[in-house]
Amino acid sequence: MMSRSSSSKGLVRDGVRRSLWAVVLSTLAFVVSMLLPSLMNMQQALENRKGMIVDGARASELAQSWKSSLADAAIYIGGENALVKLAVILLAVVAGTAMFAYLHDKRKVDFYHSLPVSREKLYLVNFVTGAVCVIAPYLVLRVLTLVCAHAMGFGEAVSVGTYLGVILCDILFFLLMYAMSALSTILCGNTIIALLLQLWVYLAPLAIQMMHEGLLSLYCKTYDSISYSDLFNHLRLSPAATYFMVNGANYGSGLADNFIRAGKPAYMLLAEYAAAALFIIAL
């Protein structure tokens, strides 16, 4: 019979306990990027509304101002909050690197591989541990932010369906970039090299496309700049860049006037990234 300490649940529980710093870091990151900006925005909107009432604003003006306040709140609460996306990307890099950095230390490798646990199971435990350390605080802060929004009267800003789409999108992109970070760390024999490889993997498609556009614009006088939709197609290999172009389960509505996908469902894109995440994790 497998002992409790060597069971999958026991190993994950012990891993999370040893990685409390990651839980604290994730909680702090989402408080600063998600909860605080939302509270500050909603509080400012309420103060502005109170000032308009004191000044004797007409009902139509109050309604228009409130509609604008709800739209602004939706940005911070929903899927167009760039601070949350940045936090997700950074935490994916930190978790992916930290959970597998032991492979770069011979003494730690000897210790972990001497445990009565297969290497496949050890990989799965480390991967799940890192995911739990980030996703659990994320979900808690998402729920807390939504509760605060309803308590302050901004429940109409984002529907429940849209909010669930935002949560699923954030988790999907986190798992994809977390898997890419973990794979880079496993393949490299040095943590610094692993971080540089991750930087290249995340940003190389964007950098290459920018250089391509810049050189053509500089040396080809008849060159017509690429459209936003074509640029998006070229950036599909860069999940970090694409992440900022989606709003939950839809493409971002405020990206650009000539972006034909703006506001439309992004189910196919998310399915492609989900398949990519599963493939990388299975490696």
What positions do the PLM features span?
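Long, hydrophobic alpha-helical segments
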Residues: 79-108, 127
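Secretory targeting signals
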Residues: 71-81, 129-194, 198, 206-221
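Terminal transmembrane helical anchor/hairpin motif
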Residues: 4-5, 40-78, 203-283
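Juxtamembrane/interface segments at transmembrane-helix termini
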Residues: 44, 101-105, 109, 192, ...
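Helix-loop-helix units of permease transmembrane domains in multi-pass membrane transporters
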Residues: 100-132
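Aromatic- and glycine-rich beta-strand/loop motifs that create alpha-glucan
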Residues: 1-24
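Hydrophobic cores of alpha-helical transmembrane segments in multi-pass inner/ER membrane proteins
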Residues: 92-94, 172-179, 272-282
